Amino acid sequence: MPGDSPVVSKRAAPKPRRAAMPGDSPVVSKPPDGAGPGDKAGGLGKAAAQMAAAPAAGKKLPRLPKCARCRNHGYSSPLKGHKRFCMWRDCQCKKCSLIAERQRVMAAQVALRRQQAQEEELGISHPVPLPSAPEPVVKKSSSSSSCLLQDSSSPAHSTSTVAAAAASAPPEGRMLIQDIPSIPSRGHLESTSDLVVDSTYYSSFYQPSLYPYYNNLYNYSQYQMAVATESSSSETGGTFVGSAMKNSLRSLPATYMSSQSGKQWQMKGMENRHAMSSQYRMCSYYPPTSYLGQGVGSPTCVTQILASEDTPSYSESKARVFSPPSSQDSGLGCLSSSESTKGDLECEPHQEPGAFAVSPVLEGE
């Protein structure tokens, strides 16, 4: 009512406290029943603190990160959605510089962990580190070919990457591919760009054979090798041919003197024929010549034709038949069917491709 006087709230007078005795337990005082507007704000803060402390004991609340730059300058700002509007995002003070450095380090660590995880998925567990100091690298393959990479003395270029790929090399002789980066900011530039590759490296792509007449694709030569005679041969022609062939075959390697079964090729008597399989009849890149070289596999059949009318003595036939050529190899001479001797050139295929027999034909008996 307008006539009523305003009601003044009365506060309860506090009771006098007695002095605490040593044996008494601490007593928690209760808040007063009535509270003013100032006390109401304090009561709300205490209630909020009690409500926050109650679930903290049972369940941990999610973490609410705050802006570190604002904290350095005395402000507490939640980090969510605050980065674009932070007043100290471009601050260059000492504390904010430490924050920026820590962020760069953490970003580098995250990128490194991601790269390691990708390498483990791909199966690359331990990457090969590059050598610190450039040194000559020599890698030898099983085909006795080497690749020598040497550093030149003139620092002409600054950056270069060298990748040597041996695609045509055998799988046993693999070559290590190394990338050699160079840093432009070095004081003393090490010239890793000018690399000299040894000429022996290219020998792995095409290796010439050890013997000059060993050039066919399947390692079959185009010339035919003279063969040794059997020591137990009783014919006069076989013995004569064997002695001359033994003298001329001293320089031949022992590998081509024996067949797969380990027996020597033999020139036998009248009953044996010269046998040759069809797989050895290959065309040659060179025209047929009148002398014999190393290896077997020529499509021509070698027979020695000794006619009694044309050979008055063995010395003349020896000088005429086994006349060494003048230019290339100390091979044996060969009599072809176009010469003036009388005889038959007989070639019959046999079942055994590894056995070759040359039969002399004696006429006039």
UniProtKB/Swiss-Prot annotation:
<dbReference type="GO" id="GO:0030238">
    <property type="term" value="P:male sex determination"/>
</dbReference>
<keyword id="KW-0479">Metal-binding</keyword>
<keyword id="KW-0221">Differentiation</keyword>
<dbReference type="Pfam" id="PF00751">
    <property type="entry name" value="DM"/>
</dbReference>
<dbReference type="GO" id="GO:0072520">
    <property type="term" value="P:seminiferous tubule development"/>
</dbReference>
<dbReference type="GO" id="GO:0000978">
    <property type="term" value="F:RNA polymerase II cis-regulatory region sequence-specific DNA binding"/>
</dbReference>
<dbReference type="InterPro" id="IPR036407">
    <property type="entry name" value="DM_DNA-bd_sf"/>
</dbReference>
<feature type="compositionally biased region" description="Polar residues">
    <location>
        <begin position="324"/>
        <end position="340"/>
    </location>
</feature>
<feature type="region of interest" description="Disordered">
    <location>
        <begin position="1"/>
        <end position="47"/>
    </location>
</feature>
<keyword id="KW-0217">Developmental protein</keyword>
<comment type="similarity">
    <text>Belongs to the DMRT family.</text>
</comment>
<dbReference type="InterPro" id="IPR026607">
    <property type="entry name" value="DMRT"/>
</dbReference>
<feature type="region of interest" description="Disordered">
    <location>
        <begin position="120"/>
        <end position="170"/>
    </location>
</feature>
<feature type="compositionally biased region" description="Basic and acidic residues">
    <location>
        <begin position="341"/>
        <end position="351"/>
    </location>
</feature>
<keyword id="KW-0010">Activator</keyword>
<keyword id="KW-0726">Sexual differentiation</keyword>
<keyword id="KW-0678">Repressor</keyword>
<keyword id="KW-0804">Transcription</keyword>
<protein>
    <recommendedName>
        <fullName>Doublesex- and mab-3-related transcription factor 1</fullName>
    </recommendedName>
</protein>
<dbReference type="GO" id="GO:0000981">
    <property type="term" value="F:DNA-binding transcription factor activity, RNA polymerase II-specific"/>
</dbReference>
<feature type="compositionally biased region" description="Gly residues">
    <location>
        <begin position="35"/>
        <end position="45"/>
    </location>
</feature>
<dbReference type="GO" id="GO:0046872">
    <property type="term" value="F:metal ion binding"/>
</dbReference>
<feature type="DNA-binding region" description="DM">
    <location>
        <begin position="63"/>
        <end position="109"/>
    </location>
</feature>
<keyword id="KW-0238">DNA-binding</keyword>
<keyword id="KW-0539">Nucleus</keyword>
<dbReference type="InterPro" id="IPR022114">
    <property type="entry name" value="DMRT1-like"/>
</dbReference>
<dbReference type="GO" id="GO:0030154">
    <property type="term" value="P:cell differentiation"/>
</dbReference>
<dbReference type="GO" id="GO:0006357">
    <property type="term" value="P:regulation of transcription by RNA polymerase II"/>
</dbReference>
<feature type="compositionally biased region" description="Low complexity">
    <location>
        <begin position="141"/>
        <end position="170"/>
    </location>
</feature>
<feature type="region of interest" description="Disordered">
    <location>
        <begin position="316"/>
        <end position="365"/>
    </location>
</feature>
<comment type="function">
    <text>Transcription factor that plays a key role in male sex determination. Acts both as a transcription repressor and repressor.</text>
</comment>
<keyword id="KW-0862">Zinc</keyword>
<dbReference type="Pfam" id="PF12374">
    <property type="entry name" value="Dmrt1"/>
</dbReference>
<dbReference type="InterPro" id="IPR001275">
    <property type="entry name" value="DM_DNA-bd"/>
</dbReference>
<dbReference type="GO" id="GO:0005634">
    <property type="term" value="C:nucleus"/>
</dbReference>
<dbReference type="GO" id="GO:0007548">
    <property type="term" value="P:sex differentiation"/>
</dbReference>
<keyword id="KW-0805">Transcription regulation</keyword>
